[in-house]
Regions:
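Charged, amphipathic alpha-helical linkers/stalks
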Residues: 2-91
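Ankyrin repeat structural motif
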Residues: 98, 132-140, 161-170, 177-181
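Generic surface-pattern signal
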Residues: 34, 41-45, 57, 86, ...
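Ankyrin-repeat C-terminal turn/loop position
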Residues: 143-145, 173
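Repeat-mediated protein-protein interaction surfaces in helical alpha-solenoids
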Residues: 91-108, 135
Length: 187
């Protein structure tokens, strides 16, 4: 409910009188999911309002736009992770769309040339995304962990928790199993 007010700004979703009643919970979550999907599908620059700090120099907006886009993309990924972490009443179709967004915004994804916000958030040691195994499991279910992305993650997450390193090594071994030349000679 906090994310509905914080990011989505949909007043009709903030109805505390319905949130506690189990009969309306499914309906509320469907409304939340549709608002979340609309937010994710919006252009990243949507809603940008330049704030002129100096004497209305162009440099002011040149610095503001990249920061705004980065924050907006991070908000989208944060909400996707949050929803996939707590998937109660999440439809299969909505799950597919959320997972697709994650896949597209990883290295080697279809939108990777624009940015790799998911990867950047995972590699930032100041966030929970690179330190909690739950997010790696979400990426695994979404199909984001390929041989290439795991190698990049291992390089960038040098000081990752042992649990995450073990998880990534295990996943990498699963993906390369059968592709190893020497495995043919094992007994």
């Amino acid at each position: 409910m906090a994310s509905a007010v914080r990011v989505l700004k949909k007043e009709e979703l903030c109805r505390p009188e319905l949130a506690g009643k189990s009969a309306f919970h499914r309906e509320w979550m469907k409304e939340y999911d549709s608002a979340l999907l609309r937010f994710i599908q919006e252009e990243d620059a949507e809603g940008f309002e330049p704030v002129f700090i100096g004497w209305f120099h162009v440099e002011d907006t040149d610095e503001q736009i990249p920061r705004y886009l980065k924050k907006r993309r991070e908000d989208k990924v944060e909400l996707i992770f949050q929803r996939l972490l707590y998937p109660e009443y999440l439809s299969g179709e909505d799950r597919t769309l959320l997972e697709k967004y994650l896949r597209e915004h990883m290295p080697y994804g279809s939108r990777a040339k624009e940015h790799t916000v998911v990867f950047d958030m995972l590699c930032d040691p100041s966030t929970e995304y690179g330190t909690d195994i739950a997010y790696m499991k979400i990426l695994e279910k979404a199909g984001c962990l390929t041989k290439e992305t795991i190698s990049l993650l291992m390089e960038q997450m040098e000081e990752a928790a042992a649990e995450i390193t073990a998880f990534l090594l295990k996943k990498q071994a699963e993906l390369t199993k059968g592709n190893d030349y020497f495995s043919e000679f094992e007994l």
